[in-house]
Amino acid sequence: MNGILISLEGPDGAGKTTVLQEILPEIQKMKREVVPTREPGGVRVAEEIRQIILDPKNTEIDSKTELMLFAAARRLHMQEKMLPALRAGKVVIVDRFIDSSVAYQGYGRDLGVEVVDWLNYFATDGLKPDLTLYFDIDTDVALERIMKNRADEVNRLDLERAEMHRKVREGYLEIVAKEPGRFVKIDASQSLEKVVADTLEVLKKRFVSEF
């Protein structure tokens, strides 16, 4: 494979999905074709699994079921969309990938990092991003954003207790510290304009020959 894989990570409320939408016009100027996508989802069956995972009515889904649903969606997405694009030399930029499972299920759900790492490896055959942008934000600020900006469309994970969201953020910070060569941390508490500018600066510096 000679493509480039970039992932965007962060707690709910960090604004990474909005940032991706904002940077797309600029990164689509890269010399290679850019393929934006998301997890869970990205392909038909994985999008259907996404609806099951996030539906607030599905309260019977326990932590282990949730983890395996994410892994199944990830496998489908990788096989059908990500790998073909990477093999064709394209730039794949994905909103959430393997680190979300480690942060949310490994730390947030207390399933353990080793278990989640193993399942991630099994589902992806060891595929890892070339670069991961981690959008960091205080948990209380993030939850306030969720209630303010997404009050009409909160999902099952949004409704979790604040303590779970704090564990997720703490987990992310530990993950970032373990792989400083892969991660770049961006302060997501800034204005959207500043976060977008910081994100583009990182991408253009890291992949200077691609622009």
UniProtKB/Swiss-Prot annotation:
Protein name per the record: Thymidylate kinase
Functional note: Phosphorylation of dTMP to form dTDP in both de novo and salvage pathways of dTTP synthesis.
Entry annotated with the keyword Kinase: yes
HAMAP family: Thymidylate_kinase
Catalyzed reaction equations: dTMP + ATP = dTDP + ADP
Gene: tmk
Keywords on record: ATP-binding, Kinase, Nucleotide biosynthesis, Nucleotide-binding, Transferase
GO biological process: one example: dUDP biosynthetic process
PANTHER family (alphabetical): THYMIDYLATE KINASE (PTHR10344), UMP-CMP KINASE 2, MITOCHONDRIAL (PTHR10344:SF4)
